[in-house]
């Protein structure tokens, strides 16, 4: 599993996985490459992309472009999560919970890359079930997208933020 990090303007880009895939035809096999990347601004915006091409650099480029187009906003709370969240995609399930200052990102592989570029600095996370990088990334982003800030919950319930936080 390759990890490449670049700064593109204000966006952090990370390469999570490159995979060689083949198509069998009458004359033999045709090989191509897939790339899984995540991009984020380190301040709550994150997206992932999956690109496929005959050459590795082209696959990475396609994945980066798709990641930039598919970004979501995540409501962070001083570098950690608002509350414990679960995310799922196909066979992968992830659980993430906020952690105190100085804990760091305790997460594995693909989940760590997503959390780093999203701007999360302290989190405890665990992946269950399938650890296929694509599914783990999708499950992580699903969990982050489902996280609600106290302001959002208060607005939905028609209460003040103080009432929500107790």
From Swiss-Prot:
One of its GO terms (molecular function) is structural constituent of ribosome. Keywords: Ribonucleoprotein, Ribosomal protein, RNA-binding, rRNA-binding. SUPFAM superfamilies: dsRNA-binding domain-like, Ribosomal protein S5 domain 2-like. It holds the Pfam family Ribosomal_S5_C. InterPro entries: Ribosomal_Su5_D2-typ_SF, Ribosomal_uS5, Ribosomal_uS5_bac-type, Ribosomal_uS5_C, Ribosomal_uS5_N, Ribosomal_uS5_N_CS, Ribsml_uS5_D2-typ_fold_subgr. Coiled coil: none annotated. It comes from the Bacteria. One of its GO terms (cellular component) is small ribosomal subunit. The keyword RNA-binding applies. Gene3D superfamilies: 3.30.160.20, 3.30.230.10. One of its GO terms (biological process) is translation. Residues 11-74 form the S5 DRBM domain. The N-terminal domain interacts with the head of the 30S subunit; the C-terminal domain interacts with the body and contacts protein S4. The interaction surface between S4 and S5 is involved in control of translational fidelity. Belongs to the universal ribosomal protein uS5 family. Part of the 30S ribosomal subunit. Contacts proteins S4 and S8. With S4 and S12 plays an important role in translational accuracy. This is Small ribosomal subunit protein uS5. It comes from Cronobacter sakazakii (strain ATCC BAA-894) (Enterobacter sakazakii). The gene is rpsE.
